[in-house]
């Protein structure tokens, strides 16, 4: 459920009852997308635009402007969750599923999940600062060449780099080249552009639990969306365990443009947006900001994967399939969110894919998780 209020650009808070009703409809549209094969829209942007037109035709004219604003806010919400502009996503059933149980906030941050994994490993099992540049596959082993000259020999390699890195580097990273089916999967699956902006204030200007501000632009105000990075922002949310911090969610071309801007411009623009949509000129400037830069980060080159117009029903399966040696043994295994056909784009997909590939090797050596730390170390 969307928490907080949707506001118009003139500072009017839209009735929460109307917002809730539209949000429920929006979730229904999501579920129904791709189910009707006749007259299939070209892409998801067209699909949701058509749905907006349909609901306006059935609604009281006095509610039209607010319905329009709520749907446009939710389109930015959907764009953030998909990973990029909705015009890049085909209007079909992609097989994506929500994991049962809903969202979970991790109070100590995601690093605590890593701690739980490597706290049980031998002290020298994890080597940091070793940027792998080349993976040289031979019949009996694999050599990993690192940036500063180090190299490692292994029987098996689990590749966990992002799809963005694979897209940019797989031809020079892997020798011999990856199988054609895997190269095609790397090309065909989309890789998104998503970022967050954290704004830290000396004193919060909002009431705790009521700080959510979602931007409801009118259709007429979005004609220049492609050239205005901030019009890709879905809204501002409170941050768990950080009572004086808001986070802005942004995706698509706006997320990429954001990375090119100076901090001061980002501070200015976010403050002006909050003042405009809250109709409150007293909203202060943040003390400082922190923002992600996933698109330009050379170790990610984007955010997370999504179905685009080239993605096929077997693309994710082809990406996750291991590369075998001549003895039919798994030599290169692939993990990461983009190798999960059902939960792609999520953190739980990334985590479960790593466990999946570890289990693949355990099964290869006929080990069980209980003795993996002892026996697998001696066999590998």
Task: Label every model-predicted segment.
Residues 1-380:
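FAD-dinucleotide binding site
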């Amino acid at each position: 459920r969307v928490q907080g209020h949707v506001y118009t650009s003139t500072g009017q808070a839209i009735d929460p009852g109307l917002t809730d009703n539209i949000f429920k409809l929006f979730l229904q549209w999501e579920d129904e997308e791709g189910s009707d094969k006749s007259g299939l829209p070209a892409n998801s942007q067209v699909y949701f635009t058509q749905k907006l037109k349909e609901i306006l035709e059935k609604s009281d004219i006095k509610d039209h402007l607010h319905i329009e604003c709520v749907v446009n806010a939710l389109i930015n919400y959907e764009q953030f969750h998909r990973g990029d502009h909705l015009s890049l996503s085909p209007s079909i059933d992609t097989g994506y599923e929500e994991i049962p149980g809903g969202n979970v906030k991790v109070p100590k941050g995601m690093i605590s999940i890593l701690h739980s994994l490597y706290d049980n490993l031998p002290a020298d099992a994890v080597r940091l600062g070793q940027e792998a540049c080349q993976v040289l596959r031979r019949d009996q082993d694999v050599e990993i060449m690192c940036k500063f000259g180090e190299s490692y020999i292994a029987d098996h390699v689990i590749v966990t780099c992002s799809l963005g890195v694979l897209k940019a580097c797989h031809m020079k990273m892997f020798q011999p080249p990856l199988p054609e089916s895997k190269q095609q999967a790397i090309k065909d699956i989309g890789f998104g552009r998503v970022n967050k902006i954290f704004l830290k204030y000396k004193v919060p200007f909002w009431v705790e639990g009521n700080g959510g501000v979602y931007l409801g632009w009118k259709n007429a105000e979005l004609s220049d969306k492609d050239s205005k990075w901030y019009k890709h922002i879905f809204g501002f949310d409170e941050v768990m365990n950080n009572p004086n911090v808001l986070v802005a969610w942004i995706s698509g071309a706006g997320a990429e443009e954001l990375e090119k801007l100076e901090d001061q411009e980002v501070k200015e623009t976010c403050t002006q947006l909050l003042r405009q949509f809250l109709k409150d000129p007293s909203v202060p400037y943040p003390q400082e900001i922190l923002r992600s830069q996933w698109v330009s980060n050379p170790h990610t080159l984007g955010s997370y994967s999504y179905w685009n117009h080239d993605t096929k029903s077997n693309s994710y399966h082809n990406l996750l399939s291991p590369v075998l040696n001549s003895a039919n043994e798994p030599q290169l295994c692939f993990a990461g969110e983009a190798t999960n056909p059902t939960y792609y784009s999520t953190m739980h997909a990334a985590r479960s894919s790593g466990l999946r590939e570890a289990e693949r090797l355990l099964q290869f050596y006929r080990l069980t998780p209980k003795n993996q730390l002892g026996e697998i170390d001696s066999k590998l």
